[in-house]
Amino acid sequence: NDCDMYKILKKLGKCGCFAGVHCENAGVIDALIAEAKKEGRLGPENHPLVRPDTMEAEAVHRLLVIAKEADAPVMVVHLTNKKAFEEVMRARANGQEVYAETCPQYLEFTCDVYKREDGRNFVCSPPMKGQESQDALWKAIKNGMIDTVATDHCPFQSYEKDWGKDDFTKIPNGCPGVENLYPYMLDAANSGKITFERAVELCSTNVAKIFGCDNKGSISVGKDADIVIYDKDKDFTISVDNMHSDLDHTIWEGKQLHGYPIRTYLRGNVVYDNGDFVGTPGLGEYVKRSPRKH
């Protein structure tokens, strides 16, 4: 509730932290879901209808008003639509410290996917939105107005998605994405949609800066040697058959990429090489973060 949100944001601000917040108006959405069920509208094509742009934008607006009163920075996670983004820009214009994140699924797919036979596989919240919103997100990315691109990775197997084949409200919400984030954003750079520098900022540099990961985010003296080698001429088609995640489907099936990562170094150690994980179990380390200054 708003009272708790105010208290939490204020406490986090004083501690040098900030909250990443999922923004949708749950109360109105519950009412819209009840109306849809009463009217017998139970297919996945109704998922974006009961979670409209306005209910995300309203929640973003309310969050930012409360954050301003609490004098606290905040991040709006998995931003999906133009109206919600306009609320972020309005708050920034008033001097607020607001970060915005979006995800590849919102940059690639629109709400039309819910009309497909496999539409239930795309059910996530917030849902994919219309073409106008997708265009606005790409424009914001190009202009540097969106800070990071993440995945909201939350996969389910087909049998789990099938729980809602007769009632979209029973479909577990979430899609896979973590394995395809860098390939997708680097493909956008390779095709000229954005620059390679911008892709790196969105997926690495900005993330490290915002979250205080001082040893990460760039190739420079004193930083960890976390490096991706990218072959811009290698063609790759995403399929569940060539993914490393233990899944029986992916919403990215058949997506063609021009260019693909061929090697990954973690602190100077090769952990991925031409499609194979070659890292040693236990090589990972705790990443200490620095407190923020607001």
Task: Annotate each language-model stretch with its function.
Residues D4, G177, L181, H244:
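Short acidic-hydrophobic sequence patches enriched in Asp/Glu that either
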Residues E24, T80, C103, C154, ...:
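Anionic group-transfer/hydrolysis microenvironments
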Residues R41-D71, N121, N143, D147-V149, ...:
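His/Asp/Glu-enriched, well-ordered alpha-helical/loop segment
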Residues W163, D167, V221-V287:
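C-terminal cap of metal-dependent C-N hydrolases
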Residues Y286-H294:
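Short, solvent-exposed cationic patches
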